[in-house]
Design a protein with these regions (language model features):
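Cytochrome P450 proximal C-terminal region
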Residues: 2-5, 42, 133, 177-180, ...
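Cytochrome P450 I-helix active-site segment
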Residues: 13-23, 126, 229-237, 280-329, ...
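Cytochrome P450 catalytic-domain helical core, especially the substrate-recognition surface
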Residues: 15-39, 57, 65, 83-169, ...
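Conserved cytochrome P450 catalytic core segment spanning the I/J/K helices
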Residues: 22, 26-29, 118, 207-274, ...
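Conserved cytochrome P450 K-helix E-x-x-R motif and the immediately C-terminal K′/meander segment
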Residues: 26-46, 212, 216, 302-344
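Short active-site loop/helix that positions an aromatic residue
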Residues: 64-75
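Cytochrome P450 catalytic-core helices
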Residues: 269-288, 292, 406-421
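Conserved cytochrome P450 K-helix/beta-meander segment immediately N-terminal to the heme-binding cysteine loop
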Residues: 356-383
Length: 462
């Protein structure tokens, strides 16, 4: 990895250009499978290349070189996020949001939300999370039916986050959040669809509903503020406290985008990942047997002991980590060059838009022997293949690494543990190969279904 400011005397290479079609450029490769497309670019052109999508030019930096660069001071100084997220900020009438800020402004927002997005925010509530999950399974996973897994997981995520954060799960808004997120990410963030799509009634209705949800969350959070002790605050309470106590940091204009953020962030990411875990575990009977044995032992004693939860679930945790390697949500990170710099011998100009392909090493045999094989033991010592520098980036890299990482790890582990403990599931056919989608984030297709054969353990008990 190397990066220097352009003022330094360096030998600059000519950056190769990715071959694409007239007008659309590399759109179809990106739309079909962005992860595979970025790997192809790395293998063909190296860690730096240029490509066009719908008339816009981007620089793609990828591989371990790019992943490691993101964590350096040079990466922090040379790249910023604002351009890609400003359209979303404007759409909500806000002044700023966490994902679109850098430097001190970004740190200020992370400090406000850090506790609420950490696993400490649900300490002492694991059994409550289990009960919420059981309710979701009883409601959305009927015995004898083929269940659309991504949709069922989306309802579970909103049920969990809503109940834990506000005491109320806004399940009536799931489809609106999903629709609004799809349009906003495709049109305003990744810019792979024309802006005129935002005039569609389907989007306008969904956006209006999400705004209504945000306004209701504001009213509820204001009502709780006077009666909630600082040590008892959750994420929503912390955001409202910042608004009331330091309005310059959290003005009223930013409340809706900040308060609905957990739903928008978690709906696709956690739901896509857990849906992919269901597929991977069911696809590999030997993994399924290990996971079931493990989770049955976890719940055999009744209420959970929260201490060292993930250490008690090496097979399930390995399955989740391996799923996140093969089906990453953060295929690439979107950035703009904040100054002229040279990366791996290639000049990148201030203001140029970049894709940072941090997931490319996930699929490289050099780092993961048998990279295409689902192997849940890669993460245990002495192998620990994920600890090689720059090879594993399921939550992104750099200053914008997912703030909710530790919370998501617990949420996904408990959700999957309960699913495989409670339900007897099967793929629609043994030979089924997962169909995937790329928008708004990569993951299993909404058409992916599993059949609920029955309950492994009685619905009314653990």
């Amino acid at each position: 990895m190397s990066a220097t400011q352009s003022a330094e005397p360096v030998v600059v290479k000519e950056t190769p250009r990715v071959r694409g079609l007239p007008l659309v450029g590399s759109l179809f490769g990106m739309a079909r499978d962005p992860g595979a497309f970025f790997v192809h670019c790395y293998r063909t052109y190296g860690p730096v290349c240029r490509l066009r999508i719908l008339g816009r030019e981007y620089v793609l930096i990828s591989g371990v070189e790019a992943a490691n660069f993101m964590g350096t001071r040079a990466g922090k100084d040379c790249l910023r996020s604002k351009e890609f997220w400003q359209g979303l900020v404007n759409e909500f009438g806000a002044s700023r949001m966490l994902t679109g800020e850098d430097g001190d402004s970004h740190k200020e927002l992370r400090d406000i939300m850090r506790n609420g997005y950490s696993k400490e925010s649900i300490k002492g509530r694991y059994n409550e999370l289990v009960a919420i999950t059981d309710g979701s399974l009883a409601r959305d996973w009927p015995v004898g039916k083929a269940v659309p897994v991504v949709e069922a997981m989306q309802y579970m995520v909103v049920d969990q986050l809503g109940t834990i954060l506000t005491g109320v799960a806004p399940l009536d808004y799931v489809k609106d959040i999903r629709t609004a997120t799809l349009y906003i990410l495709n049109v305003l963030v990744t810019r792979q669809r024309p802006r005129i799509l935002l005039k569609r009634p389907q989007y306008r209705k969904a956006r209006s509903r999400v705004m209504d949800l945000g306004r209701q969350m504001i009213r509820d959070a204001k009502a709780r503020y006077a009666t909630t002790r600082p040590e008892d605050r959750n994420l929503i309470d912390d955001i409202m406290a910042a608004h009331i106590e330091t309005p310059a940091k959290m003005p009223a204009s930013d409340l809706i985008v900040s308060l609905t953020g957990p739903y928008i962030a978690g709906l696709d990411t956690v739901a896509n990942t857990t849906a992919a875990v269901v597929y991977c575990v069911l696809k590999h009977p030997e993994v399924k047997a290990r996971v079931q044995k493990e989770v049955d032992e976890l719940f055999a004693g009744g209420d959970l002991d929260e201490e060292g939860l993930l250490r008690k679930l090496p097979a399930l945790n390995g399955a989740i980590m391996e799923t996140m390697r093969l089906y990453p949500i953060a295929v690439a990170q979107l950035r703009a060059a904040s100054k002229d710099f040279v990366f791996e011998g290639h000049r990148i100009r201030e203001g140029e838009m970049l894709y940072v392909g941090t997931s490319v090493p996930h699929f490289m045999e050099e780092y993961w022997p048998g990279a295409g094989t689902f192997d849940i033991d890669r993460y245990q010592k002495p192998r620990a293949e994920h600890l090689q520098p720059g090879v594993y980036s399921p939550y992104g890299r750099g200053p914008h690494t997912c703030l909710g990482k530790s919370l998501a790890e617990v949420q996904m582990a408990l959700s999957m543990a309960r699913v495989f403990h409670k339900l007897d599931l099967e793929l629609e056919s043994p030979g089924y190969v997962l169909e995937t989608k790329t928008a708004p984030t990569p993951g299993p297709s909404m058409r992916f279904k599993v059949r609920v054969k029955g309950y492994r353990h009685a619905a009314a008990s653990s």
